[in-house]
Amino acid sequence: MQFLHNKNVFALLLSQSFQSLAGVLVTIVLMVRIYQMTDSVFLAGLILSFMSFASIAASFCVSPVLRILGFKKVLAGANLLRAVFIILMAYSVTHHGQAFFWITLLFVFCFSFAGAFFQPARFALLPIIVPKKQYVKANGVISLSNQLFLTAGWGLGGLLTYAVPFELVVGAAICLFVLSGASISVLHVNEEEAAGTAETASVRSIWKDLMIIPIVRDITVMDMLEALAGSVWSSAILLAFTAAVLHETEVWWGMFNASYFIGAIVGSVIAIRFSSFFERNMGYAIMFSSLVMSALTLLFSFSPVPFLCALACAAMGPFYQVRDICQETMLQEVIPEQKRIGIMAAKNAILTPWSGVTYSIMGLVADAAGAKIAFIAAAALYIMTFLIALAQPRLVHYRRENRVQ
């Protein structure tokens, strides 16, 4: 993995890992704290809602801010700002009263607004610091690192909120964001070249490009369908399936979650190991993964044996990761260089709030028809993404020479 000796790649990887872990810890500790203070699931859930609103708002100014201030200043500064907002959130959330609650949500909005700059910028920076032939491998390594740190964050976050004082968890998150910003500060990029990836066109033009570049449009639609399908794997629906359909305890519920994350990590390793194969067959990998995920979801929904369900979860992880890595690589290649940041910010502005809505939709399906029907509906949605890919020859038969100029 020679490209990891590239200091720029390593710095970007380190920065993302630190900020991913810190972001998860902050989300968990805030939601738990607010729930303990208010005894309201709705009020605790407003944390995620305000984070989504911030992502939408940030999508309209990511490109101009990065173009004017430069990548390093914005990314390093954003991480340091997030550390400051954690301090402010920690102060306000420890005070009772409606006013302090809304002040906390305001700080949550600012915290997430600053964080919304990272992913579009990282998406645009990677093709600048990595040769094209290493896109799949680089995306695979970053995805693997992200999965490991997210797994650690969600796995340990709940435990830490109960076993470790609130102030220590907050302090750890602050340190992680400072380290993330410090990692970005050692990044060496040509700011003029990087600024060329920040679109100077109007917001309307960026959203128009999102809809008229065929592969970008198709992948966005597929992502929306797969987000709706994937919401059945949320903790609440999966727990209901475990209890009502399998008649098992929370132990198996935890095993299903763990199995998927293990599979996702394996998927990233597979994408790295066989990157040259996936580079030649990205379209087929995306299409085939959707088909297999549909089959595995059906297997999960109809299997009466918990062990087989756990195997289905583990098997789904690699296909999901390979598809995700191939999609990101394909987007990096087909989106014109100067439009990468704007288009990805617009795409995230669609998918972030949509992801929140999907949990409500599938939750209603599970309440009305049962958890098993919700999983069968998810399998049907995966089939729809397979059919969309199958109906788009330019996506299925994608070759690098198809890149939009």
Swiss-Prot record:
The lineage of its organism: Bacteria, Bacillati, Bacillota, Bacilli, Bacillales. It comes from the Bacteria. InterPro entries: MFS, MFS_trans_sf. This is Uncharacterized MFS-type transporter YjbB. The keyword Transport applies. It is a multi-pass membrane protein. Keywords: Cell membrane, Membrane, Transmembrane, Transmembrane helix, Transport. Coiled coil: none annotated. PANTHER family: INTEGRAL MEMBRANE EFFLUX PROTEIN-RELATED (PTHR23513), MAJOR FACILITATOR SUPERFAMILY (MFS) PROFILE DOMAIN-CONTAINING PROTEIN (PTHR23513:SF19). One of its GO terms (biological process) is response to antibiotic.
